[in-house]
């Protein structure tokens, strides 16, 4: 017997990614049940995967990270300190999972939307302001938008329309247009402390906006400045297709 319940598409796709992972990970007789459940859901959800392939990929990646963290926890002889670290990482990934589901539901104007009770987290991102730099750092901004509930991105006025189109699908990415860098300089000694203390934002800066700027292996050094894995540049890069 089965029951049909109304759920948001984000929640349904989340369930499907977990079933995908189970079908990959479970290799005994239990796998048949996972395959049946996955294939049953896939019939109704395939069109949404085709519509939002990037979001589905990221959601599956987050759930795979949670799976692996739990796998390192259950039945393993680990210290209390390590157990606490794993639990903290799982909570962080669960929050990222919630944000990706919320992005999908927003794109579909879903009436059913999951909500969390925690205080919203905000970040401020200040990178180099050339249009090419904006594209190089798209992966970083997209990743941060899964770690924070709002990400403010500095951009030049003359590139505002281009950058708006780059993040048109995600209302949690807010643009902060300026004429040029001098507007928020000196950044490290004045603007950054003000943003952190008065606005309660976590500040991310790279390149010449860091305390001791050093450029190498461009643009990968920018990701090193942000303490983000270099793979994020390509894995999280996404620009939505515009309507014709």
Regions found by a protein language model. Give the residues of each.
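Catalytic machinery of carbohydrate-active enzymes
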Residues: 120-244
């Amino acid at each position: 017997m089965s029951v049909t319940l109304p759920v948001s598409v984000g929640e349904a796709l989340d369930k499907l990614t977990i079933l995908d992972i189970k079908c990959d990970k479970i290799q005994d007789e239990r796998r048949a049940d996972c395959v049946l459940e996955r294939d049953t859901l896939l019939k109704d959800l395939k069109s949404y995967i085709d519509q939002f392939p990037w979001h589905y990929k990221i959601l599956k990646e987050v759930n795979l990270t949670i799976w692996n963290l739990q796998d390192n926890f259950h039945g393993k002889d680990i210290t209390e300190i390590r157990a606490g670290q794993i639990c903290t990482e799982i909570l962080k990934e669960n929050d990222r999972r919630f944000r990706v589901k919320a992005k999908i539901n927003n794109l579909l104007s879903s009436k059913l939307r999951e909500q969390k009770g925690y205080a919203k987290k905000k970040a401020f991102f200040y990178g180099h302001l050339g249009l090419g730099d904006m594209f190089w750092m798209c992966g970083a901004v997209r990743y941060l938008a899964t770690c924070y509930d709002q990400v403010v991105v500095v951009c030049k006025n003359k590139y505002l329309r281009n950058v708006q189109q780059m993040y048109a699908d995600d209302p949690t990415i807010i643009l902060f247009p300026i004429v040029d860098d001098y507007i928020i300089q000196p950044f490290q000694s004045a603007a950054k402390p003000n943003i952190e203390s008065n606005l309660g934002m976590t500040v991310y800066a790279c390149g010449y906006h860091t305390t001791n700027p050093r450029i190498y292996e461009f643009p990968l050094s920018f990701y090193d400045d942000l303490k983000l894995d270099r793979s994020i540049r390509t894995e999280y890069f996404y620009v939505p297709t515009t309507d014709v």
